[in-house]
Structures are given as structure tokens and as C-alpha cells.
From Swiss-Prot:
Keyword Cytoplasm: yes
Residues annotated with N6-acetyllysine modification: 4, 116, 119, 234, 239, 252, 264
Pfam families the record matches: HJURP_C (PF12347), SRF-TF (PF00319)
Protein name (Swiss-Prot/TrEMBL): Myocyte-specific enhancer factor 2C
GO molecular function: chromatin binding; cis-regulatory region sequence-specific DNA binding; DNA binding; DNA-binding transcription activator activity, RNA polymerase II-specific; DNA-binding transcription factor activity; DNA-binding transcription factor activity, RNA polymerase II-specific; DNA-binding transcription factor binding; histone deacetylase binding
The organism of origin for this protein: Rattus norvegicus
Modified sites of kind Phosphoserine: 59, 98, 106, 110, 222, 228, 240, 396, 419, 445
Location(s), subcellular: Nucleus; Cytoplasm, Sarcoplasm
Biased composition (Polar residues): 375-390
Site (Cleavage): 432-433
Domain notes: The beta domain is required for enhancement of transcriptional activity.
Amino acid sequence: MGRKKIQITRIMDERNRQVTFTKRKFGLMKKAYELSVLCDCEIALIIFNSTNKLFQYASTDMDKVLLKYTEYNEPHESRTNSDIVETLRKKGLNGCDSPDPDADDSVGHSPESEDKYRKINEDIDLMISRQRLCAVPPPNFEMPVTIPVSSHNSLVYSNPVSSLGNPNLLPLAHPSLQRNSMSPGVTHRPPSAGNTGGLMGGDLTSGAGTSAGNGYGNPRNSPGLLVSPGNLNKNIQAKSPPPMNLGMNNRKPDLRVLIPPGSKNTMPSVSEDVDLLLNQRINNSQSAQSLATPVVSVATPTLPGQGMGGYPSAISTTYGTEYSLSSADLSSLSGFNTASALHLGSVTGWQQQHLHNMPPSALSQLGACTSTHLSQSSNLSLPSTQSLNIKSEPVSPPRDRTTTPSRYPQHTRHEAGRSPVDSLSSCSSSYDGSDREDHRNEFHSPIGLTRPSPDERESPSVKRMRLSEGWAT
């Protein structure tokens, strides 16, 4: 297939004309170079374009060639455009048509080149669109952390934690919005986001505290979740986001504590301290999971008319199963459900009236038992000295229930030399579900968990009489 021929006429398109000039000028200089080398001659080219811009070429030196030209007086050959056209006609070639050695001079304006450029542009657009589709940002996971307290004028904290957010701050929310957010069968855990800092203690303590009605001088030193920032600033290296919802079908029953109905206008009593210390949930189905960001949630009853099991406590500090319970430990929990576990929901009314009758030895043993598990499992160091700010009187036995005199001392001695796992099983409550209803009527703790009523406070002689009757051995 022969070369494409172009018509030798003036190019009307300015851009095409400029492209053709540039290419053919270089081709002309290339031919002059080849001729000068092949035939050992001197060549000088002087070109002015349509804008009178000078382009020159000389095989050796332009001044030397021009000097020789001006001094040359011999006859010589001189050609013009008309001479070239006439010569081409004589040779049988059409002067208006010429084989184009540079057939791609106007490559930017030929139909073939336009199709090629159009295809290239389409490919580039497709590539850009694919990159945009692949650059979709990851979704944000928002997991709430709510901390309602049993007082009506308490604050509710919620923390929407995203995958890139900062879980260190707990913004405020309305209490009514978070009332049903803590179902006992669902564990909410925020996704891990690298090294996460600890929750500051000032954000977790109850913000609506009055010293009236609870016997404490400072509300922030009594029944709130007192967390020292130093213990919680431990960086936890997280690996992968744990499952967001864990149904009851995929895990064993959690250990829970039922809370008696709270007073309407008073701060949470020592029962909340005991609840905070005892209510550590163990997720046995997550034994393969790594340590993840904790979710600290406190939800206690807010109305005095609620039943014992109406709003169970959802206090939970969910971690990995570093101290998980084996099947033997779980089977041993049934013994403590009737003998030594502190099932707060089954405390009778008379026992609830003798909260401050707990002796110092029992309170210190209870605080040591629970704080040992907390310090080894979740670094939430709750000092046991909080529980010692109570009237120190011996524990009175139940009025209607008969209790052996040596039952409570045996319980404290049994707890003294126990490992953290066993102490957890003894300090934790019974399972969720139907076990709560069963153990209300079966077990009554010998330790009362609410302060005495005004009637009991005004009659100390009656309490001493019962004390002498119950412990006379």
C-alpha cells in the first residue's frame, strides 16, 4: 500500500499549519545533514516562517558558508518554487500532489487520530471512575456507652464511638433516651481503633450528688464509679473489631446482680458500690477474642415502684476471657447460688433495713474479694476503704429466717484463700433468666444491703435484743 498523498496547497488551519511546519522543517534539516555527510558538502538553510521568525541550519558554520556565498561569482544553479513545479510536471508528476513522507503531519486532525484519541480518553475516564468507586470511605461504627444512675436527677452519659473517633470523652444525653438501651442479653462493644486510652474518672462519676440522704460527705467519694485516671490510661493493643451483637444462643448465661429498688430522691447507697464491685460479666464464648476496648455501662432502677427483676442491673465491664470460667467453675457456681453468692435481688425487706450493721471485717473482706478481681481483670482499682464509711455493728440474723451462727464466719474464711477466678465466682451473682426468680425465694444473704429505716435507728435496744438472741452460742 502506497503512501498517502496530500495536496500541496496552503494549509488553512493555523494549528495544523504550525504542526506541519515544525515537522517538515526538522525533516528538511535532517535531509540537509544526510546530504552534507554523504556527499561531503556544505549546506546552509535560512527559513523565515509566516510570523517572520528566523530558523537557520548550517552543516559547519553559518558565517563561513554565507561568506563563501557572497564571494562566489561563478555561474550556479538557482531554483524557485515555479522551477520545482515545472520540473515535476516534466517528469510526469502532478505538482499539486506529492507523496508525503511525513503522512502523520496533521495527525491531530485526521479521523483516524480523532478516533484513537477518543478511545484513549474513554479509557482514562473509566479508570478514574473505578478509582472513585474503590475509594469509598469505611463505614463508621457507633456504639453507645450509657451510665444512668438510680437517682432521678442523675446524668446519663453516652459515647458514640466511631472507627476513627476518640473514645476518651463521654458526651451527655437525656436519661429517658437511654432507658431501654441496656438489654441484659446483648453485649455492646465498640470496635477497636488501635491504641485507645482509658476513660477518665471525672467523666464516669455521678454528677448529680447531694450529701443529704446517703450519709456521705462527698458524693464523688461515695457510690459513683470512682476510677483513677492512672489505672485507666493503659494502652490496649486491639486487633480486630469484635462482633457487635452477641445473642443469648451463642454464649453462656452472664453473671448478673439484681439491685433492690432505689430511693427517689437519694443517691445510690452502698448497694451500688457492691454492685459495681461484684457485677463482672464473663463471656465464655469469646475465649478466642483478643482484649478489646471496654464498655463500662451502669443502669440501675430509677423508680421506687419497680419490682426486683423489672430492671436488672446492666453494669458490665466487658473484656477478653483472661480469667474465664471453665465448666468446672461454672458448675461450682450453683453451690454459691444458695450458700455464699450475694444475690442482691433476693434480699428481704428486713435485711435491706440493716445496711449499716455490716461489721468492718465483713466489709473489708467483701471489698478485698471484689477489688482483687477488678485489679487483675480490668484495672478498675476501686479501693476497699470506700466501704468502711459505714456504722460498724455486728450483723443481725434475719427475723423470720433461721441462720446458723457459724455460717457467715465460715463464708469469710472460705473466701480468704481463694484464687481470683474462685473469688469471682463467689462474689458474683447467679445466672440471668429464670434463676433470678428461683433464688429470690431460696436464698437470702446474711448481709443487709440498704441502710436501716428510721424506726430501726430509733430503737437500738430492740436490735441489741435480737443480736443477743441470734448469736448466743
